[in-house]
Amino acid sequence: MSRKISRRKFMATTAAGAVAVSFKFPAPAIAQAAPFKLGLLTVKTGPLAQGGIQMEQGVQVFLKEKNNMMAGRKVEFFSADTGGNPAGAKTKAQELVERDKVDVILGPLAAFELLAITDYIAQAKTPLLSLAAAEDVTQRRPNPYFLRASACSSQAMHPMADYAAKEMKLKNVITISEDFAFGYEQMGGFQQTFEDNGGKILKKLWPPIVTPDYTPYLAQIADCDGVCQGFAGSNPLRFMKQYAAAGLKFPVVTGETGGDDALLHAFGDEAIGLVSCCPYTADLENESNKRFLAAMAKDYNVLPGFYAAGLYVNCQVVEAGLQKNGGKSDDKEKLMAALRSVSLTETPRGAIKFDHFGNVVGDFFIRKLEKANGKLINKTVKTYHNVSQFWTYDEKKFLQQPVYSRDFPPVKS
């Protein structure tokens, strides 16, 4: 058989080859469509597990809503249980970065966990978005690869103290919170703003994070007109029950974790009257929150709180940043810049943006715990708009003072 090829057949074959070759040119775009790897550091055991479980639920609700896609890329999700301790957080962070090769990490939950991994995250140049509220990560020792879309430790406590002094007319308050960084920084923020408004902190009590019986501390609560508690996880439940059982009647104020919406199903009437300040509230009327509430009810049959909403919002930020960066995640410095430039108008908590340290600026809500139609609810009574981590203080002067600690500010005699 002749192997001669006619000119017409040659031209047709060449043209077909050219078309075939042309489809091979966009290889970088195809490579960039590789799965986007999203990691989560959370807590599934111990006293902080209440919040940690809701963190993962918030992520799962978002991913389901988006059909497991972000910016045109399929999402591979990796969840790690830190056990709620610094060593566990560091080990799991290293596994997510070095073994799983994640593009972005969400979490961890606790301030002491964040402090344990912040240097490693900066060295690994892996973007980290966290609810963990350790203040100096966005203040005196800023991490360029960190972003916080929820609140730093004292951010809710500044408006809470303002409200306690001006609206509740409290004058002499005793504070009580767990004996670790989040507790110190919450109470420090409350104390500074409360004292600036003419109030006085009589004493500060620091029970360990695992305290089955608060009786020795409750015995020290006397001769005041209010109490500020800063407990997290399931500890607010135990504290409020024991507080009422001890016959204490002083009004109690708290931050986002101490009066979380997710605890309402487990609180009893002893919590009625609890006043809290939070960057998220379930009674917020916006379309994003309505969708979020419906999805959480459908998938998990729960009322979401600060932890679930916070992780859902973090996912919104990741998606928006990835879109701003053209769907690319290989250059982590560019991705981080895109993430920090995000501002959102539609989230379950309302509009948010970030300051130049990577901490959120947004609305904070004062809620009063009430009983309506046989159910406990947090009813919003006041909104503080565009609250930053520096409250109304001058940023430069604020950063010149020490980070809030067990002893700063000191109790004045």
Labelled PLM ranges:
Residues 1-18, 24-25:
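N-terminal secretory signal peptides and thylakoid transit peptides that target proteins
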Residues 25-44:
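C-terminal segment of N-terminal export signals and the immediately downstream linker at the start
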Residues 39-58, 62, 80-86, 109-110, ...:
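Extracytoplasmic "Venus flytrap"
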Residues 50-55, 69-140, 207-214, 237:
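Beta-alpha junction/loop-to-helix N-cap segments that form part of ligand/metal-binding clefts
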Residues 91, 135-137, 144-247, 282-291, ...:
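Extracellular/periplasmic Venus flytrap/periplasmic-binding protein
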Residues 96, 100-109, 129-131, 174-177, ...:
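Periplasmic-binding protein-like
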Residues 189, 233, 238, 283-342:
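Extracellular/periplasmic ligand-binding modules, especially the Venus flytrap/periplasmic-binding
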Residues 343, 347-413:
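Solvent-exposed, acidic/polar segments of extracytosolic/periplasmic ligand-binding ectodomains
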